[in-house]
Amino acid sequence: MRSLEHFAAENAKSARAFLSAVGMPRPLQQIEIVEIASAKAELLKPLRQGHSLGVVSEAGCPAIADPGAAVIEAAHREGFRVVPLVGPSSIVLALMASGLEGQRFAFCGYLPRGGAERKKRIGELERRSQREKQTEIFIETPYRNDVLLAALVEACNPGTRLCVAADLTLPSESVQTKPIAEWRRAKAAIGRRPAVFLLQATA
């Protein structure tokens, strides 16, 4: 990554701050950052000109529940080589620390915002988890964390296990896995922290 001169990012300002923090060897003025949403026609221009192009995520792992996926798709469509770089993924880290089923799991992205639709989707995921004996993984925008947690605690069976992994890789990191019945008694709140939710229904 340190050798790249061209990047695609959701936000150029925060991408420059990140590149500065990781100590890019070349001056930031020499680095071109194209914003993914505003310049789709220009995204692959560096690749077409023979340069490499890096994808920087605003938060989390590039292209996983992230707008960067559009860049990767376009690169494959035009036949360019795609090379994933080693880095943390909150989804995998949360699963590693959860104690839930790690052989069979599914990442479901964001659940519906509407109360009735969300409740229906939670029921579907809980039933699928029980049927397939797998862990269901999903995320939420931080300011809606506590709404989702309350919906899970209300909708799920008492024996279903729920893990909430918040602030992963930070000093304030918290990973808690317990049955829904215990979450109900605890009346816990996550607050506006980046969090991953993992659910495993009992047989």
Label each residue range with its predicted role.
Residues 25, 66, 70-128:
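Class I SAM-dependent methyltransferase SAM-binding "motif I" and its flanking Rossmann-like core
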Residues 18, 121, 148-149:
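Hydrophobic side chains in well-ordered alpha-helices
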Residues 26-35, 82, 102-109, 158-165:
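Short hydrophobic/aromatic-enriched beta-strand-loop microsegments
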Residues 15-16, 91-92, 145-146:
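Short, well-ordered alpha-helical microsegments
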Residues 2-85:
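Class I S-adenosyl-L-methionine
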Residues 32-34, 48-52, 131-203:
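A contiguous loop/helix-start segment that scaffolds small-molecule binding in enzyme catalytic cores
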Residues 61, 65, 111, 115, ...:
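Conserved phosphate/pyrophosphate-binding and hydrolysis machinery centered on Walker-type P-loop NTPases
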Residues 13, 31-39, 88-89, 109-114, ...:
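Short, acidic/turn-prone active-site loops that include or flank metal/cofactor-
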